[in-house]
Amino acid sequence: MTHLLTIDPTLIDWSRAQFALTAIYHWLFVPLTLGLALIMGIMETCYYRTGKLFWKETAVFWQRLFGVNFAMGVATGIILEFEFGTNWSNYSWFVGDIFGAPLAVEGIVAFFMESTFVAVMYFGWEKVSRGFHLASTWLTGLGATISAWWILVANAWMQYPVGCEFNPDTVRNEMTSFIDVALSPFAVDKFFHTVTSTWVVGAVFVCAVSCWYLLRRREQEMARQSIRIASIVGIVAAVLTMTTGDFSAVKVAETQPMKLAAMEALYDGGEGVSLTAIAAVNPLEQPDYAQGGEAPLRIAIPNGLSLLATHSIDGYVPGVNDILNGYTRDGKRELSAEEKMERGRRAITTLATYRRLKAADATDARLDSLATQLKQDMPYFGYGYIKDRAELVPYIPVNFYAFRIMVGVGTLLMLFFLVIGHIAWRKDIPATRRGLYLAALAMLPLTYIASEAGWIVAELGRQPWAIQDMMPTVAAVSDLQSGSVALTFFLFLILFTVLLIAEVSIMCRVIRNYNANK
């Protein structure tokens, strides 16, 4: 794998850009699928319990919108998975035994579950019993959620690799415990934070569409009842998202301190570190960390970051310089960047020597000695591909502002749900609250921006790693011509844009043409 040190940098950039493009487009569809699945399940449950035709018509309406979005999510998701084999073949070879397992379970169990019951949900009205149809609706949503679980397990493993061991004979990482991978604390926190945030997206979407009807004084009963359900889902989901986000912050502080430092533009850490509310971080250039200091015009909450990251107001939080230079936390010394890079290069050299002697039928004692040395240095294997310590620092401005967009919009959404929920659960929703309805429409794009911002922090914050500390992106990429990757980037850009325009157009047509009295 040492030849990867000379790979074309533009190939890495185009491969990353293509994967980012696909992931961003895919994530436009996934949150609405999971969020609408919950809300339409609640609405059909109301129909099952009351027998009122109104609830059936309401559930059918939201199911139509769900179906359009579901199809787009599947299409973009399939392309995303194929990119691991086409653009990231070294990654697939190195950890395919581990990474492929949760994706295989997702495909065999969750996807088939969704595919089966979504057909019953759409075509089973008047053909199956109300109870079976209700079960199919809930199982469609459950299948989508299970699918999200296994995909997030795979992603969480990239952020915090556990349950595996490197085999020098095959030059691959092999799974040693499926349970450790599937039930990693990082995966559990990531799943609950992600899924509850999708419920927020679904609730905002329902409120926005319903408010569009109220603005035009159409389908007012359906709109009011939908807002009532969505506002409750939104309030509960927003609280859960904030709570699980707090748990995730602690895990990030423990396992990915550089990501946390990037989110905060924290150069020099310490105890009792303040949480930055806002600061004038230059969005166009990476700060000079060697000089230390802090961002100008900084407004901060005293001891806030220590409380968030360690649940102690005096907790120690390392900054970028601390991580690069080495630091001590809880009595444990963390190596400096140079020490990790040296250990990584030694691991690469040891592996090459092991394989050469293995091919030459060397003695078992010599091979065992090399294997022992390799095992000691393997936690730093990925650092051997890092040329300069500056590569270990994610791009600070994007992480800093994306995190604040996510948190800021999330806080705003909590207030939005409280206001619209309070109004919705009165006897009647006034048709004259035009400002509120317009605000609901404005919240929809903001919610999507915040949702995407969360994933930007999660993925860009761990750069330069494809797998944290184990494999940098420079070592994960396929040996392709950068021009071919650039070409497919623009082809996918056109394709995904057409798909997005098609979805929005179809949804708008469904919303405009809906008439409950027909």
Give residue spans per PLM region.
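Polytopic transmembrane helical bundles with strong interfacial aromatic enrichment
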Residues: M1-K518
